[in-house]
């Protein structure tokens, strides 16, 4: 009988006076064989399969295949994984709720039951992506930024509040509370989930998917989770399992301890560089080794957070005593902590000293070898030793701008009646921001200590630096104040600007007008230093060409120095009141000082700040909504529009159409990010999206950002490939979202060309290099291309989430054969493309791509289909994952 293994593994667990039913891996091992050395992360997957075994979506063969992974540390098998819950943020959450509302309209039109369009598992949406650093450097910055956020985003927030009452199991954490991953780490994450089923308590691992790539941060708490596109998350919350291949697992052994003066940020940048080099895309990474015995949970969370930057699906830290300590500190109940301890030990998921699981491959890092580091100027994996930053900046300046540093003279400017000179290499943004580091008390206390020492000696922030502090939760403000550091951070301009992502996602706000004018006038290459996780070109601010990731204390140090050309290991940061030079080593806090400061963090702070986490500010409470199951769409709205993805959809799918005569819309290089494809930041007035907003009566000051407009497909399709730093090789020497409408030669906006092709009924293609779609789990980077008419993307390789998103929107991802690239083929972008027999395409199959050159010559390239699983093929054949889900509901 197909359920035998599931039934045979059922057991009970007694924790104090409470009995839990659970699916026991040791009992299952009697049939599966010894699984002791299976990586802990795979044990979580194994339990998931065991619990959901139904003989259909999960079979006994699936369970055996995962257990037999141990034999070769690899398995070629698709499995159906069902996470316990879903996490969202508002930039990805708004379009997801738009999709759910549109799905209700489609189900209604096709005669189905709209009540079926409801989450079957808990969904938490944390509003954190909308606050922008408009005001900074004074005590009123926080309240003013919150006021502007509520004013700009009122319509979006009305919509989310409607969603909260319209959909079951859907909770919204209001704006001004914190960053979703930090709220997840400090409050939402349980490590072990329990719920009443048929009158019995059932315990199982806390697992999740999230609509943000940094969902991986929760793996620091021993919770398996990763980012998926919004469309995949919607399918998951509606009961559709996540289709995945059993992953390879790379072991990362940490030994030793960090040296004096080295931070968790230095460690994570080193780990990121090592893992990118090793190659972990599509794989799990699991950390082990005696180095974990002393690695605080906040440091683990910092490392887990940057999984997307090193390319892994997740970076998993098994549950151990340090996990339990953190859960107690952050206010979890003693009952919950005891359940986590008992369950993890019973299931063999507890980390014991000396554990050596079987891994597909492994790396080792002696933490004593880690040095002070930054990453930049435009990729998070490009770690640079602190001493080498001036050299790296200079190299990037000459490379990117084809001009030497000495050619650029400082530019005079006046601000607040004072005359200044803005140098090339100036740091114009210094931001303590992002869940990556603001969840970590040790680096934040280090920043506070450094600020205190600097102010005491009379050092000041350079006048051209826009400084900001945006913690991921209110607890941070509590402990910085308790330690007495807030006045010193304020003195240096690091006033609280909001609780949210801010600069890290491009919401850095405008630079002061005199600074912007000086940068443009001198064509200066300036820098941003932030404690974030992403530094792609054009992401932080349109005028800032180099972006550097650094620890919070180094962010403060660069605000004092004000220049990327200064070597902080030997050049002075400034001068004290006597005129003597002050060096970084003079004010860098000791490990003992940091440890003493961290003792100020208390459980009471977590209890206080999370007691009313779903309540919100008076402004949030005042938002009025119509209580209805379907949304009242406003035809004149520029924020929330009924999406067109289900227009004309029928109850049964049409056969997949072959691609004939497709034109190449863009030919792109390596490491094209989802930021390049669908930017989140500011909207240029002269762009197609800017022109659309102005034509609908929106003033420039009210444009807001692309990210905030993701509920309006009209803005987003116009913003597709609109990043100001994208380079389309079809128009050499031109930066920004431009192309040619073939066979003509005129350079036009990508959106305008796509619309012209649509009128001509010509399908479109995109050609790209390696790591296409890296970065954020941005479903609009697939939705936008779909609306432009793109049918196929042919690249050298794809990043995991984006590949999945393309399929989820009915776009075919194809991979060039090994060693074949657009360059080796000599492609110009003028080729026409034919791909036939798509009705019979198979996962991983070889697909002949017929290229017709502009001179009529023909060539066949044998590409690999990157539809990887049978389930993904079903989605593709249904024209997308949500179409498939709707048809399932109707049946």
Where are these regions (language model features)?
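Fe-S-dependent hydro-lyases/dehydratases of central metabolism
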Residues: 1-891
